[in-house]
């Protein structure tokens, strides 16, 4: 299933910002920050439903895989919700987002999105933006829930062992914690890293890697484009 954000016009935000400053971003700018910016990348991943130990994964072994909840949404927005309907085969690919949800621009865009989508009180904007997180967070957003057929704790353990971020040619940094949360038929995986001095860098690239066994991701982000209001935002 292709998510709605991949149909939007391609415009990477980061090095170049819209004329209007926050909080006067329009809906298009909000969605671009959340889904196609210096802090967020869309990626199509191939799903290999073969265990690395002998045997294949059977669709009937996955709780809830054959029948979706009756009240599931038909489209996936940049903050949540999934498709619905009877699933007859395991998906062969998935469209996911790899992003830095703790970066201030994403927190601001998320707050604006929620206020407009959920009809919340605009006076709660600063409350919704919140304070910076203790950890630097990389999020894998929109992962098919079937991957967690053995439970989210298994996914957390697998990602904790495999994930890294690497700044330039420096030694890869491993996460201190992983949080996997199911949302109907999708799952969001948050990978938490200590904020070592490398996270304040302003040059080079940072490469994100994670292996979930059914698929793996490797994505580079350019630190020079991740500057916002005079500082690195990760």
Question: What residues fall within each predicted segment?
Answer:
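Sec-dependent N-terminal signal peptides
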Residues: 2-12
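PEST-like low-complexity, intrinsically disordered acidic/proline/serine-rich tracts
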Residues: 15-234
């Amino acid at each position: 299933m292709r998510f709605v954000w991949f149909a939007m016009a391609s415009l990477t935000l980061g090095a170049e910002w819209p004329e209007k400053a926050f909080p006067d971003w329009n809906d298009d700018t909000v969605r671009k920050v959340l889904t196609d910016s210096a802090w967020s990348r869309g990626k199509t991943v191939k799903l290999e439903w073969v265990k690395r130990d002998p045997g294949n994964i059977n669709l009937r072994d996955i709780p809830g895989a054959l029948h979706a909840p009756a009240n599931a949404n038909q489209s996936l927005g940049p903050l949540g919700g999934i498709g619905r309907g009877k699933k007859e085969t395991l998906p062969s690919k998935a469209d996911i987002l790899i992003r830095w949800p703790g970066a201030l621009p994403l927190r601001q865009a998320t707050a604006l999105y929620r206020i407009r989508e959920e009809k919340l009180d605009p006076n709660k904007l600063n409350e919704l933006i919140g304070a910076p997180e203790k950890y630097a967070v990389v999020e894998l957003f929109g992962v098919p829930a079937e991957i967690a057929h053995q439970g989210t704790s298994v996914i957390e353990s697998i990602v904790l062992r495999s994930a890294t971020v690497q700044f330039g040619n420096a030694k890869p940094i491993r996460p201190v914690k992983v949080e996997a949360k199911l949302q109907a038929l999708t799952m969001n995986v948050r990978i938490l890293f200590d904020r070592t001095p490398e996270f304040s860098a302003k040059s080079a690239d940072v490469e994100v890697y994670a292996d979930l066994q059914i698929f793996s991701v490797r994505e580079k982000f350019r630190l020079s484009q991740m500057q916002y209001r005079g500082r690195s935002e990760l």
